[in-house]
Amino acid sequence: MSITTTRRRNQDSVCCKATRASIKVEAVSGQTVFEKQKLLHNFDELPEWQKDNDKILTGYVRETLSWKKCLYSLFYWNNETVNIYTHLVPAIVYFVFAITLTNYFLIPVFPSTSWSDYTVINIFLMGAFSCLMCSSCFHCMKQHSEKQSNFWSKLDYLGIISLISCSMIPIIYFGYFDHISYFSLFTIVTLVLATFCTVCVLHDKFNTSTFRPFRAMFFILFGFSGLLPLTTGFFKFGIQGVLNRIKVSFVFWEALFYISGAVIYGFRIPETLAPGKFDFFGSSHQIFHIMVVLGSVCHLKAIIDSYKLMHSHIHP
């Protein structure tokens, strides 16, 4: 065999190896591009810690380990998009209302109107803001990692406690405007219960999937603690007396929205009835979010109308 022929075969062999290597690199590169383009994943592709609702089958943002990627999920459609924006937009609205004292323009001014009135209204606005913003941040950031998911989940629960507490205080204030000792007593009771609830939600076991029905019942019971000042008012002022102080009708609608939302959330209706059909629209968590917003709007209306009732009573 000649030297020239041997060299030619060696060159051909090298070329073949280079070609195979090139094809391999292109395949790997193509796979990398594909992986970058694959933003959404199915339930069975998730790590175990992300598997919460097995009735939602598609549209997941898989563990990112990146704050940038979490924020980027705000700009493409996934099964958390509705959850994020149904609370982000109202949170911003409530915050603007609070910091600009928009309630100056929302409510009439009476001769007896004081800064205390605006303060308690803004307590509710900031409580609603903190609840909705914590919720929105949780749904955006929870896919970062298991550790961050647990952290933001606890903030989400603290936001709910904040909303419940900050909802009760203004109603108690307007209901007992001429009985400061009652207002102080029920405010202290509310804050003590809020502290107890805070200790509970900070416990890691509270955040597990098995505690889902318990979590729903937990927050319902905390909300029902508001019946204590209401019942006391019925005994002290009579039914008509309470109706002259508090806009009870909107409080009723608020409770209906909150309880209905919590029950739907706790039992995962409707996705339990039709898995995979409500991955992007109409899932229990999305319905719960909308119910919370509607309930908060009803409560704001109840507070403003109670303010009007109080000052109409002082200056008929």
UniProtKB/Swiss-Prot annotation:
Pfam families per record: HlyIII
Localization: Endoplasmic reticulum membrane
Membrane topology: Multi-pass membrane protein
Entry-listed glycosylation sites: 79, 207
Induction (free text): Expression is regulated by the zinc metabolism transcription factor ZAP1 via its promoter ZRE element (zinc-responsive element).
One BP annotation, GO: intracellular zinc ion homeostasis
Main location: endoplasmic reticulum
Transmembrane segments: 90-110, 118-138, 157-177, 182-202, 219-239, 246-266, 280-300
Source taxon at top rank: Eukaryota
GO MF term (any one): signaling receptor activity
Lumenal side: 1-89, 139-156, 203-218, 267-279
Coiled-coil residue windows: none
Keywords from the UniProt entry: Endoplasmic reticulum, Glycoprotein, Membrane, Transmembrane, Transmembrane helix
Cytoplasmic compartment residues: 111-117, 178-181, 240-245, 301-316
A single GO cellular-component term on record: endoplasmic reticulum membrane
UniProt xrefs under InterPro entries: AdipoR/HlyIII-related (IPR004254)
Chain's role: ADIPOR-like receptor involved in zinc metabolism either by altering membrane sterol content or by directly altering cellular zinc levels.
PANTHER family to which the protein is assigned, alphabetical: ADIPOR-LIKE RECEPTOR IZH1 (PTHR20855:SF95), ADIPOR/PROGESTIN RECEPTOR-RELATED (PTHR20855)
Family per similarity comment: Belongs to the ADIPOR family.
Protein name per Swiss-Prot or TrEMBL: ADIPOR-like receptor IZH1
